[in-house]
């Protein structure tokens, strides 16, 4: 069914695209069989949704909010609570920096305000909508999806979806670090029948090894405030002090 077949889209649509969870490498179809390829495939699917809306009669009256599930289920040098979000559609500022702190709840509150829905609980009731990202004078917008050139390594039928498709990064064809056989062996015994059925800590380390290589895995942050009394915390000593001399054992 085409987007405009019914001429009556619902006021709110929730859409889940889950290939960015990655997995099932031995069974993956059309060569989308490594994490890099699966994430690129998922990104392209999101782009195609936005592309379809942007070139439809609903473009002037549809806002699209995009967030990730389990955006960072694991530590690195940045707080593991961080995430990304995208907003596309009319009245969205473009090419501007907005220095506001938003959370997923901010996004939910914004959707509620736009649709005239009452807050669900105290959590979203106490959060401001994301008004700083909007400019009501900006009505024109468009978007054309462009797949990553990573996907050139697959058998995805681009021409059936987008004739004369243009790849986002110039058409070069980088290769994943490891092939499907490596990933299938590393995840043997894993359950990929649905998201989040495996030990996330174990899988995170496999993903790190397979996509980053020999770089050490990030240590999990303790959350302790180490700004005060750092010398004592690090057990620093006076560098002028010498270690005591220990006499050699007697030959007797």
Model feature map: region roles:
Residues 1-252:
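N-terminal pro-sequences and low-complexity stem/linker regions of secreted or lumenal proteins
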